[in-house]
Amino acid sequence: MKNVRILDCTLRDGGRIIDCAFPDEETKEISRRLAEAKIDIIEVGFLRDRRKVNYQGNSTFFTDVDQIRPFVNKEKKGVLYTAFIDYGMCDIDTLKPYDGTSIDAIRFGFTKKNYDEEKEEVIRWINVIKEKGYKLFIQGVNSLNYTDRELLEIVDMVNEAHPYSFGIVDTYGAMYMDDVDRLYGLIDHNMSSDICINFHSHNNYQLSFAFAQEVIKLSGTSNRQIIIDGTLGGMGKVAGNLNTELIVDFLVRKKQYDYELDEIFDLLDDYIVKYTLDHKWGYSTSAMMAGIYKSHPNNVIYLTEKFRLDSKDIGKILSMIDPATRQRYDYDNIEKLYIEYVSEKVDDHEAINKLKEIIGNREVVV
């Protein structure tokens, strides 16, 4: 019995690089053909608050589970369909009950700040999702942000809520292998054995594929069911994600799983390659800087696109931002820090003193 499943989140996390503006027909085909490739779990997009998002199609920012119905194939057995809800960005009380015609599961993400400041409300959202009948995936954003003690407190909450899965999330692409080993060990040894571990990484250090193999190896020692996230071509903001095609190939050739790799290649050629013409993702030194400073990718994108800065300068400005603020994005603050940094970097005192020596007391006509 296989204990590893793949969750493809191209239409959700991959789509962030194009503001999730997938044409409806493309969303339908990507979803359908991922199912044909025997991908276990397909994430079709976000669920957002209809008071803030006006859904008119051609987007995977949905506001109602009924809008997702055309993009799931209920005739394909063995496939789970999910949507992602960020805490505070959806009206959870208007979520329609599960009826078997749309998504099967909801991945629910919250930050440490959310949990520290609004713990009771975060737990209420968790309970609402379960009460509505959906399989629940709990994603504590940025796992590295928790101390071991804090993470164990979250695991206690997870054991009580008893979701389908709980995630190790490398939100800012900042993990190294020892971080993965430590987090996996803590969770695996303290979480109920029938709750899956869901691993989601970003490729800032070009380690996503290595991490996936490590988590698979670790799961073999405990018979834990695990879920590995990926996107087609690694599509995603800045460094992007684990490539779905890489983990598919690994599991087919090394573990004798039965995914259809050729179907994945066709999806890449038919739908993903075209996005690389206007949108860049993958490893870069700028992406590395985002990992080093655990920074929201939008900060790096803004500094790169607006100011055309060198990687070293990007790192210097990121280091000037408060660590907690760095995990969000505030363009006004970045503008202010950029001006401050450039002012300090451009030190013209030496040039002025040299001119004074040359000119002396002579008059200058400009």
Where are each of the predicted segments found?
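Catalytic cores and adjacent flexible loops of soluble metabolic enzymes
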Residues: 1-366
